[in-house]
C-alpha cells in the first residue's frame, strides 16, 4: 500500500479527485492527501494498518471544518473504502495505484470532440431569421420547455420542488435552463444531454447567483456601494463574470438594484442603499461589468436586474412582506436603477416577490408589460423569482396554479425559475383557448435570441473551459482587485485620533468573535475557497510582528463562551490598544434574514461594556450586512470602522486601513439610525407642513430623541481633513436648453494624502407635488496630497431636475431650486438658482 493512489468521486456538489500518498517511516505510517476541483485540506495525524486495510483520522477544512475519517482496503493495484469529511459527508471510494490524470485534463479530453473553430458573432438579422426558422419547428412541449428552468441536482435554494430528474427533463426538451450547476463537470454532462438527446438539440442556459464574485469574493454590494467607485465595481463584476463563465455559467441572477431604506430588511446587503441616483450609476456599472461590450465574448454573462419592483419597500423590513406605495414613489425612488440598467443593455429582469397595488409582481400586467416592456422598452428575458408564479395563488390573487400561470404569461413572463406552473398548466390553457400559443412564441423568441447572441446555438460548449477556470479563478490578480475594492469600501465612522495605529511600536489586542473568523465573505456566495479567506488576525499579524498581537474571542457571535469574558479581559490588560472585532454572522443578513432588533447580539454588547471599563484606547471593527444601532459605541469607543463583509481579502484590507497603509475614503450609502424607533430613516425624505423644531411643540419630531440619523447618507471620515470653498455658479437662472456650472474648490488641509467624495444635491423648492429635502445629483472622487486643492465642476441641466410630477409625466417644473455641496448629505453649503 506504500505509494501514491487516487480515486475519482461523484458528489452532489462537485466531481472530486482524491490523491493519497502513503509512507512508511520506520514502521510509522503517514498519509497526505490532495483533493482536486474543490479545495479540501486533509490532515491525517493517526494512521493504523492491519493486513491489507488502513484506517486514519484527522482534520479536514473545506467550506466547513471538522473531523475526517478514512478507511481503505487494498487489493494489488486497486483499493476501495470510505472517506468522511465535512461538507461532503461519507464518500465511497474506488481507486487505483498512481497519481492518475488530473480532472482538468480529463475534462479537456472529453471536450476535444465538441470544440469548434471559426464560429463568429451573428448579426441581429441573422439571429432573427434563425430564431424564426427554429421556432416554427418546435412542438408546444418544447416551447414550454424553453420557458422552464430546473435545478442541476436535488440541492435546493428554497422550498423543495417536486420535479423529475434534470437529466430526464433536459433529454425530453422540458427544460431550457439550469440553476445551480456549481461543478463544471455537471455543466458538461447536462449540456451534452441537451445537444445530443433533446428533440431539437437546443443548448441550455446555465444560471447562477453571481452577486459579488464567483470564486474570488469581493465586498458585498452594500459595501462596495460605499466606495462610490463605479469603475472599481465594474471591474469586480467583470472578474466575477470571467470566473463564472469559464466554468460554463452563462446567465447571472444579478445584480440586485432595489432601493433600500429599512435596515431591518436582510437584503439591504445585496443592494446599493437608499439613493436612486447612486443606485442607478452602480446598476449601470454592474451591467457593463457582467456583460462587457458584447455577450458573444466568452468572458461575459447575461445580467439580470432584480427585483422588479419595490421589493426593498417591504413593510416592517420583513422579507416577502406587503409593499404599499404610491406610483409616484414607485417611479421616482424605485424605478431609476432599473431604467439605468436597461439602458446599459441588461439582457434580463427578474420579478419581485411583493405585491404592487394588490397584485403580485409576477402576475402584474401593469408592472411587467405596460411599464417594463412598453414604457421602458425592455425586450430581454423576464425571469420569475424562485416560486413566484405559484405564489400568486398563495397571495390570494389567483384561484389555482392554472390562473397563476395565465397571469404570469399575460404579464409577459418568459422563464419560470424551478417551479412547474408553466409546464403543468400552459398546454392545457392553450387547449382551452385561455391563452394563445403566440404568447409562448413571443417568450421563446426572446429566449432563443439570447441563446444565439451568446453563441451557444452555434457552439454549445464554448463556455466550458476547465484550463481557463484553473488559470483565472481565485488568481492572485483577482485577489489583488478584491483587496483594492475592499479597502475603498471601508467607512470610518468615528476617530478621536487613535487611528491609524502604529505598526512599529506598541501592542494590540484583537478581541471578539470576528478576531480570527473566516465568516467575512457575506451572503450569496458559493466560493470553494472560503477556507482561504484572510482573517483579521492574519491581516494584523502580517502588518506587525506577531509577538505584539494578543487574541481572544471573548464570545461567539450570539452565544457566550465559558471563560470567554475573563480571557478577553486578561488579553486586553496586556495591550496598548484594543481592537474589538464584533458584528453579525453572514446568516444574519441576506434573503429571509430580517431582524427586528438591529443592535449587536447581547453577548457582544456585554463584552464591549466590560472592555470599555478598562479605559484603554479601543477601536470597534464591524463585520455586518446592514446599518446597525451604534449609539452606545459612538459614546464609549475611540474609533469605529465599518468594514461590512469585505470578501476573500478582508483581513488584509482592514489591516491596511487600521495601520494607515490606506487612508479610508468610503462613504455611507444607507443612513445609520440612532434608535430602531426611527426606522426607516433616510436623507431624501419629504418635507412636512410642520418641520421638526425644538422651539415648536407641534412639529414633526420625537419627544425622546432626535429625528436625525447617527451617521447620515454620504458620511465617512478620513485620516486627513478637507476644506470646501464657497459654491460658485456661472449663472443663477437656468434656461431649459442651457446648462449651469457649479464650482467648488476642495483642499486637503491635513497631513496625509486622501480621497474625498464631493457630493452635490439639489432641492426643488416647490413642485406640483412635494419634493424631497435633498436629492443626490452628482459626485466626484478626488485624491489630494497634503496642501493640495482642486476645483470641482458639476454641470446641471434640465434633465437633472426632472421627476414624475402630479400627472405622472416626467418633467422639470419651473421655479426655485437649491444646490447643496459637501462631504455628506448633512454637512453642506447651499446656493440658489431658478429654472425658467
Residue ranges of predicted features:
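Central antiparallel beta-sheet cores of small beta-barrel/beta-sandwich binding domains
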Residues: 1-75, 82-94
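Solvent-exposed residues in well-ordered beta-strands and their adjoining turns
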Residues: 8, 23, 36, 61, ...
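A cross-taxa feature marking solvent-exposed loop/turn segments within ectodomains of secreted
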Residues: 13-15, 40, 65, 88-90, ...
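Short, structured interface segments
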Residues: 92-100, 204
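Edge beta-strands of extracellular beta-sandwich domains
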Residues: 92-95, 829-833
Amino acid at each position: 500500500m506504500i505509494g501514491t493512489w487516487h480515486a475519482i468521486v461523484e458528489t452532489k456538489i462537485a466531481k472530486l479527485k482524491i490523491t493519497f500518498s502513503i509512507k512508511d517511516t520506520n514502521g510509522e505510517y503517514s498519509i497526505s492527501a490532495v483533493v482536486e476541483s474543490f479545495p479540501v485540506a486533509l490532515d491525517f495525524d493517526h494512521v493504523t494498518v492491519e493486513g491489507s486495510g488502513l484506517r486514519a483520522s484527522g482534520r479536514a477544512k473545506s467550506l466547513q471544518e471538522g473531523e475526517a475519517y478514512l478507511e481503505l482496503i487494498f487489493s494489488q493495484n486497486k483499493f476501495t473504502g470510505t472517506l468522511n469529511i465535512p461538507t461532503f459527508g461519507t464518500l465511497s471510494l474506488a481507486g487505483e495505484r498512481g497519481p492518475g490524470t488530473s480532472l482538468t485534463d480529463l475534462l479537456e479530453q472529453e471536450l476535444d470532440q465538441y470544440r469548434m473553430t471559426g464560429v463568429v458573432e451573428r448579426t441581429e438579422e441573422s439571429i432573427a431569421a434563425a430564431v424564426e426558422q427554429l421556432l416554427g419547428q418546435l412542438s408546444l412541449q418544447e416551447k414550454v420547455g424553453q420557458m422552464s428552468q430546473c435545478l442541476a441536482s436535488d440541492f435546493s435554494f428554497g422550498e423543495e420542488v417536486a420535479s423529475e430528474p434534470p437529466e430526464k427533463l433536459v433529454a425530453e426538451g422540458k427544460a431550457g435552463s439550469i440553476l445551480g450547476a456549481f461543478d463544471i463537470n455537471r455543466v458538461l454532462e447536462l449540456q451534452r444531454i441537451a445537444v445530443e438527446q433533446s428533440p431539437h438539440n437546443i443548448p441550455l442556459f446555465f444560471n447562477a447567483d453571481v452577486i459579488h464574485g464567483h470564486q474570488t469574493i469581493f465586498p458585498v454590494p452594500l459595501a462596495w456601494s460605499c466606495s462610490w467607485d463605479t469603475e472599481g465595481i465594474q471591474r469586480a463584476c467583470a472578474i466575477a463574470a470571467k470566473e463564472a463563465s469559464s466554468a460554463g455559467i452563462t446567465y447571472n441572477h444579478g445584480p440586485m438594484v432595489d432601493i433600500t431604506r429599512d435596515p431591518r430588511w436582510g437584503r439591504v446587503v445585496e443592494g446599493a442603499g437608499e439613493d436612486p441616483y447612486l443606485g442607478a450609476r452602480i446598476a449601470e456599472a454592474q451591467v457593463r461589468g457582467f456583460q462587457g461590450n458584447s455577450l458573444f465574448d466568452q468572458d461575459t454573462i447575461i445580467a439580470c436586474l432584480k427585483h422588479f419592483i419595490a421589493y426593498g419597500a417591504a413593510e416592517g423590513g420583513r422579507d416577502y412582506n406587503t409593499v404599499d406605495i404610491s406610483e409616484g414613489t414607485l417611479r421616482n425612488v424605485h424605478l431609476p436603477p432599473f431604467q439605468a440598467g436597461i439602458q446599459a443593455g441588461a439582457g434580463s429582469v427578474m420579478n419581485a416577490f411583493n405585491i404592487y397595488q394588490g397584485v403580485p409582481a409576477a402576475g402584474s400586467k401593469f408592472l411587467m408589460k405596460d411599464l417594463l416592456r412598453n414604457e421602458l422598452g425592455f425586450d430581454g428575458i423576464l425571469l420569475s423569482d424562485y416560486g413566484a408564479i405559484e405564489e400568486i395563488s398563495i397571495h390570494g390573487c389567483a384561484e389555482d396554479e392554472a390562473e397563476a400561470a395565465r397571469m404570469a404569461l399575460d404579464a409577459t413572463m418568459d422563464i419560470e425559475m424551478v417551479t412547474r406552473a408553466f409546464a403543468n398548466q400552459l398546454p392545457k390553457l392553450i387547449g382551452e383557448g385561455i391563452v394563445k400559443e403566440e404568447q409562448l412564441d413571443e417568450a421563446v423568441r426572446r429566449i432563443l435570441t439570447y441563446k444565439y447572441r451568446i453563441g451557444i446555438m452555434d457552439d454549445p460548449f464554448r463556455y466550458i473551459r476547465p484550463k481557463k477556470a484553473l488559470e483565472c479563478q481565485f488568481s492572485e490578480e483577482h485577489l489583488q482587485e478584491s483587496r483594492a475594492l475592499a479597502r475603498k469600501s471601508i467607512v470610518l465612522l468615528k476617530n478621536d485620533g487613535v487611528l491609524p495605529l502604529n505598526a512599529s511600536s506598541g501592542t494590540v489586542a484583537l478581541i471578539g468573535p470576528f478576531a480570527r473568523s473566516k465568516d467575512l465573505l457575506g451572503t450569496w456566495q458559493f466560493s470553494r475557497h472560503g477556507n482561504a479567506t484572510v482573517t483579521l488576525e492574519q491581516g494584523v499579524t502580517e502588518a506587525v510582528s506577531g509577538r505584539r498581537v494578543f487574541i481572544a474571542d471573548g464570545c461567539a457571535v450570539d452565544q457566550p463562551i465559558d471563560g470567554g469574558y475573563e480571557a478577553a479581559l486578561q488579553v486586553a490588560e496586556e495591550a496598548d490598544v484594543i481592537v474589538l472585532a464584533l458584528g453579525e454572522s453572514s446568516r444574519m443578513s441576506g434573503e429571509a434574514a430580517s431582524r427586528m432588533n438591529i443592535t449587536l447580539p447581547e453577548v457582544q454588547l456585554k463584552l464591549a461594556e466590560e472592555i470599555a471599563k478598562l479605559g484603554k484606547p479601543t477601536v470597534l471593527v464591524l463585520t455586518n450586512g446592514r446599518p446597525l444601532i451604534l449609539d452606545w459605541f459612538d459614546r464609549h469607543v475611540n474609533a469605529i470602522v465599518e468594514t461590512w463583509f469585505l470578501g476573500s481579502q478582508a483581513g488584509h484590507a482592514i489591516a491596511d486601513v487600521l495601520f494607515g497603509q490606506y487612508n479610508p475614503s468610503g462613504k455611507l450609502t444607507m443612513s445609520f439610525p440612532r434608535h430602531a424607533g426611527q426606522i426607516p430613516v433616510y436623507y431624501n425624505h419629504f418635507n412636512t407642513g410642520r418641520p421638526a423644531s425644538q422651539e415648536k411643540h407641534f412639529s414633526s419630531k420625537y419627544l425622546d430623541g432626535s429625528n436625525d440619523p447617527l451617521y447620515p447618507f454620504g458620511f465617512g471620515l478620513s485620516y486627513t481633513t478637507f476644506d470646501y470653498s464657497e459654491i460658485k455658479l456661472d449663472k443663477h437662472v437656468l434656461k431649459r436648453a442651457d446648462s449651469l456650472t457649479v464650482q467648488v474648490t476642495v483642499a486637503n488641509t491635513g497631513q496625509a494624502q486622501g480621497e474625498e467624495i464631493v457630493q452635490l444635491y439639489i432641492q426643488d423648492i416647490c413642485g406640483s407635488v412635494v419634493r424631497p429635502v435633498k436629492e443626490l445629483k452628482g459626485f466626484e472622487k478626488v485624491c489630494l496630497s497634503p496642501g493640495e486643492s482642486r476645483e470641482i465642476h458639476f454641470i446641471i441641466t434640465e434633465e437633472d431636475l426632472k421627476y414624475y410630477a402630479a400627472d405622472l409625466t416626467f418633467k422639470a417644473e419651473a421655479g426655485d431650486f437649491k444646490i447643496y455641496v459637501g462631504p455628506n448629505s448633512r454637512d453642506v453649503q447651499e446656493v440658489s438658482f431658478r429654472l425658467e
